[in-house]
Amino acid sequence: MRILLSNDDGYFAPGLACLAEALSVIADIVVVAPERDRSGASNSLTLDRPLSLRKSHNGFYYVNGTPTDCVHLAVTGMLDTLPDMVVSGINDGANMGDDTIYSGTVAAATEGFLLGVPSLAISLAGFSAGNFPTAARVAAEIVRRFETDKLHGPVLLNINVPDIPYDELQGLEVTRLGRRHKAEPVVKYKTPRGETVYWVGAAGPAQDAGEGTDFLAIQRKRVSVTPLQIDLTRYGQLDAVKEWLNSHALGSTRS
């Protein structure tokens, strides 16, 4: 089995190193990751300049682009054959609910999915680097399961692992995405030169953390596994929007 690894924290991130160590025992791995932290890059591609691919001293490849760039470059321009799986992570922090829209970790897995490769995004739902081995072990177990018993149809799974030792996990739960409240406002600062600058505010707290959500699974010390899809269509509103638009002919609102 051949696995392409990537992330959004950068090729030097300890979570990526921990994941690579765990998966190298059960598969041939190739690591292609951003040259710097690209958290929050979402599904962006670099289109205004060429990309470079370099190899670091630890054998990992790194790209001067986004997580999506890394997977796209690796699958369409670097590797001779499609990998059997793309695994993105281990992210330093949760990717639950609305986080998935912004997450570079999820985006790297999404790009693999779009290119026809079964893909996993794995995140540690906390900031304790000491528990990266917990998430790495979970990732290895899910990869082994996939190798012996493949899921039918396209696969894009978002996995969040509680920030606790492996022996304290209370199992695994298939979940839906929860929701967060809107993010905190930007934080304004003055530089020593008097320039006003802004930091993006913190993510909002959980709003929908009810039964079946990723938030609740993590609260219960359970691994959250959420199947994702790309289709953003709001099917329940199609008829309402159609009726709304059909009630006004084009040009009827012009003054």
Swiss-Prot record:
Alphabetized HAMAP family for the sequence: SurE
Do you know which Gene3D superfamilies this protein is assigned to?
A: Survival protein SurE-like phosphatase/nucleotidase
Print the keywords alphabetically: Cytoplasm, Hydrolase, Metal-binding, Nucleotide-binding
Q: EC number(s) for this protein?
A: 3.1.3.5
What function does the entry list? Nucleotidase that shows phosphatase activity on nucleoside 5'-monophosphates.
Pfam families to which the protein is assigned, alphabetical = SurE (PF01975)
Q: Which family does it belong to?
A: Belongs to the SurE nucleotidase family.
Protein name per its UniProtKB record: 5'-nucleotidase SurE
> For this protein, what does the record note about how its cofactor is bound?
Binds 1 divalent metal cation per subunit.
What domain of life is recorded for the organism? Bacteria
Tell me the compartments it is located in: Cytoplasm
UniProt xrefs under InterPro entries:
SurE, SurE-like_Pase/nucleotidase, SurE-like_sf
What reaction does this enzyme carry out catalytically?
A: a ribonucleoside 5'-phosphate + H2O = a ribonucleoside + phosphate
What's a single GO CC term here?
A: cytoplasm
What's the source species' lineage? Bacteria, Pseudomonadati, Pseudomonadota, Betaproteobacteria, Nitrosomonadales
Residues reported to bind a divalent metal cation: 8-9, 39, 91
User: Does the entry annotate any disulfide bonds, and if so which pairs?
Assistant: none
The cofactors it requires, by name, are: a divalent metal cation
Q: What GO molecular function annotations does the UniProt record carry, in alphabetical order?
A: 3'-nucleotidase activity; 5'-nucleotidase activity; exopolyphosphatase activity; metal ion binding; nucleotide binding
UniProt cross-references to PANTHER family, sorted A to Z:
5'-NUCLEOTIDASE SURE, 5'_3'-NUCLEOTIDASE SURE
